[in-house]
Amino acid sequence: MKNLILSATTAFLLGSVPVYAQGVTLNVPSWMWEEGQVGEWFKRNTADYEAASGNNVSQTQIPAADFEKVVITQIAGGAVPDLMTVFTSMLPPMINAGTLAPLDECIAEGGFGDRLLKSVDFAKVDGATYGVPLTMSPWSAVVNRKLLTEAGIEEMPRTVEELYAAAVAVKEKTGGYGYAFGNDMAAPLHVYINSMQWVLGFGSDWSQPDGTITANDPRNIEAISWLKRFLDEGLAPIGLGIIQARDLFLDGQVAIMFEGPWLMTQVQGEKPEMMADIDFEVVPTPTHAAITGGAFFVIPAKAANPDQACDLLTTYLEEEAQRRWLEDLLQIPGTTAEPSAEFLEENAWVGNMAEIAAQYPGGIGYAPPGYLIEAGEFRQMVVDSLSEIFSGRTSVEEGLNGLQTKLENWSATL
């Protein structure tokens, strides 16, 4: 499985070296500029581009929770980026609205097309490619084995029941949390992603590809009932945003999070002494679904400097830069990349991540099936209902029955 994900040649493609036009400033917004080692990767490769091209890059940092709303508002107001990162979920509505430029010519000129991951197909419409993958790492179970051991748990939980038992033991014996997830309703995307991990993990979803609403599917009721149980019994912290939940994990107070390898990157950067005790494991839900949202690079249709933006994109996708994304950031890059044998020996869990990504992919793009264009509105209705359920203002079954009716009525108006 590792070779399916982490395979490529190591030689640079001579044709990928761009010819730069000089003297412009590129506007490049992202939520990643200040994300620890991820931000360092971007800044290092951007500096290489600036030195080679004579151009400048305006590194516009926008928080992840606000990114979609802010950047769409800016584009509508005429402040159009030259190159930008987008969450995979943003692609369908932006393509549908005509916001993005086709990248096929850029891909051909850059010489990286044969190295792009298969997930590039998500950005293809009517034969045109409107984005290229930035990263496609799966969410799975990030585990603090030391905390589990302190609670008397010697084996990684493989079922939801075992996860619950481990959480009880962690609380009783260490005072920590066995499980944590972002449940700050002011950050709806992260709340929705976590719900996907559970409803897909129980073999269902909020909707189906043909548009059928399945909010009150019995499997969803069971999945959300488990989530509420963790909150009600104090086994998971209440009201935390995803950043605060990750901070608790870094402080050694959380045993398991359903997270991506970016949390491993954060541990390596901020608490390297913890790395020996941290593993990346299969999610202990019935289907083991590894939600894969990822991110893409795009160039807006009205970008002022599309040629220079293509050159910068080509710099980011050069083979050495992609290998460094894998080895330095411990995440799957947007193209195939060959890690060194030394790296794999020191980071055996990366091979496990690759196998999880290949074996249990699900929820590509964080979008409800059948509602890719209307995903934002759909997600918000789900999160509003989860807020009612988690706060105790309604039961799980009543809340999801109400959500079923609400979504069906809304769907009928589309």
Segment roles from a protein language model:
Residues 126, 130-134, 139, 164-212:
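Extracytoplasmic/periplasmic solute-binding protein
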Residues 88-138, 162-164, 174, 190-191, ...:
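Hinge/lid segment of periplasmic solute-binding proteins
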Residues 167-168, 173, 210-238, 279:
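Glycine-centered hinge/linker elements that transmit conformational signals in sensory
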Residues 1-20:
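Gram-negative bacterial Sec-dependent N-terminal signal peptides
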Residues 262-274, 286-384, 412-414:
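C-terminal lobe and pocket-closing loops
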Residues 6-7, 21-93, 97-99, 109-112, ...:
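Conserved N-terminal structural module of periplasmic/extracytoplasmic solute-binding proteins
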Residues 68-79, 97, 147-148, 165-169, ...:
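Short helices/loops that flank or line small-molecule/ion binding pockets
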Residues 31, 224-308:
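Extracytoplasmic/periplasmic substrate-binding proteins
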